[in-house]
């Protein structure tokens, strides 16, 4: 999704993957939920709504994958 489109997400290991590997599941899912809340609460106030909703969707997909016990897709 969003990560595949942006040039700065082209490194070998992404920070989000490192976080998933090193954090407890509860902490990692809390981080993802917090980012969803952040982007929902500022929708239309910072970046274009389409950019912010893309971020919301990305974090929601990652949360869904984490809940299912999967590694994140980028």
Range-by-range predicted roles:
Residues 1-74:
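Intrinsically disordered, low-complexity regulatory regions
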């Amino acid at each position: 999704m969003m990560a595949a489109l942006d040039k700065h997400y082209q490194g070998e290991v992404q920070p989000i993957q490192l976080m998933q590997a090193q954090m407890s599941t509860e902490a990692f899912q809390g981080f993802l939920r917090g980012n969803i809340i952040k982007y929902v609460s500022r929708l239309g106030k910072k970046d274009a709504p389409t950019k912010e909703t893309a971020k919301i969707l990305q974090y929601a997909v990652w949360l869904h994958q984490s809940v299912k016990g999967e590694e994140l897709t980028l």
